[in-house]
């Protein structure tokens, strides 16, 4: 995708060397935005092959409200293993905040169910927001949320989503995040009777780890190929009833996968 290649170039050209929590070292800059028209194809990177199975199962795991890696491991997804404790627990991470946000009074709030109902009944609302940044529980999380807040917007029968991501690993994380939130937008559009609009990705700290620079430059040398298409295998009435088999990716022809070490 041209947007992603432009993003990589921006960080390489305008970023500065900066230390980080992991000790790896980064080239970092602050503030950026990409936009993807979901009617033009499913925004899954073509300059390297992505593992759609991991993207889809992680999103389904979030939507279940699950915070144990067992479900992911049972489905061949290992992307959270480094942060889990000996029992597979991660603390109150994304799934917990999305589905059972704990307020100061002890009440739990299912933000996803509330969001779906609000989109259906009050599509002009400017409060179609889900937050994973629960300040009172940050210290209990194995990893505080990087993609921490998203908002939906309904216009002319189309559903758009804007994500704010406080911390963005350009090489490993961002390609997954783009595809994940594009998929989330499409499935919410599906269950609310809307068409997909745009996915807008807004960033805080964007960084390329020092041990990913070679891989990023390799991607910049590769040509951008046509985007794949995503369709659903069946009509699904509830967002919580989706299964991996419901997602069909067509015409995905990426360049080969590029490996990169995860900084924990």
From Swiss-Prot:
Homodimer. InterPro entries: Thymidate_synth/dCMP_Mease, Thymidate_synth/dCMP_Mease_dom, Thymidate_synth/dCMP_Mease_sf, Thymidylate_synthase, Thymidylate_synthase_AS. DUMP binds at residues 21, 126-127, 166-169, 177, 207-209. Changing residue 7 to L: In strain: ATCC 6633. It catalyses: dUMP + (6R)-5,10-methylene-5,6,7,8-tetrahydrofolate = 7,8-dihydrofolate + dTMP. GO terms for biological process: dTMP biosynthetic process; dTTP biosynthetic process; methylation. This is Thymidylate synthase 2. Pfam families: Thymidylat_synt. GO terms for molecular function: thymidylate synthase activity.
């Amino acid at each position: 995708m041209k947007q992603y290649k432009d993003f990589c170039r921006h960080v390489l050209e305008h970023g500065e060397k900066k230390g980080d929590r992991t000790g790896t070292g980064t080239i970092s800059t602050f503030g950026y935005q990409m936009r993807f028209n979901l009617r033009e194809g499913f925004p899954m990177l073509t300059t390297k092959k992505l593992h759609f199975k991991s993207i889809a199962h992680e999103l389904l795991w979030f939507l279940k409200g699950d915070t144990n890696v067992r479900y992911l491991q049972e489905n061949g997804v290992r992307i959270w293993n480094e942060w889990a404790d000996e029992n597979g627990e991660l603390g109150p991470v994304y799934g917990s905040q999305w589905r059972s946000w704990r307020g100061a009074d002890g009440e739990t709030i299912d933000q996803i169910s509330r969001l779906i109902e609000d989109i259906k009944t009050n599509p002009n609302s400017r409060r179609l927001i889900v937050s994973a940044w629960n300040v009172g529980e940050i210290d209990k999380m194995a990893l505080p949320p990087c993609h921490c807040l998203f908002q939906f917007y309904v216009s002319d029968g189309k559903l758009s989503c804007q994500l704010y991501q406080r911390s963005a690993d350009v090489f490993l994380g961002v390609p997954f995040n783009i595809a994940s939130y594009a998929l989330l937008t499409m499935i919410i559009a599906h269950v609310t009777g809307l068409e997909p609009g745009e996915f807008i990705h807004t960033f805080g700290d964007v960084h390329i780890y020092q041990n990913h620079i070679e891989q990023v430059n390799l991607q910049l040398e590769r040509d951008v190929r046509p985007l794949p298409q995503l369709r659903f295998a069946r009509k699904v009435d509830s967002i919580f009833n989706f299964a991996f088999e419901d997602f069909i990716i067509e015409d995905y022809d990426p360049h080969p996968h590029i490996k990169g070490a995860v900084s924990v």
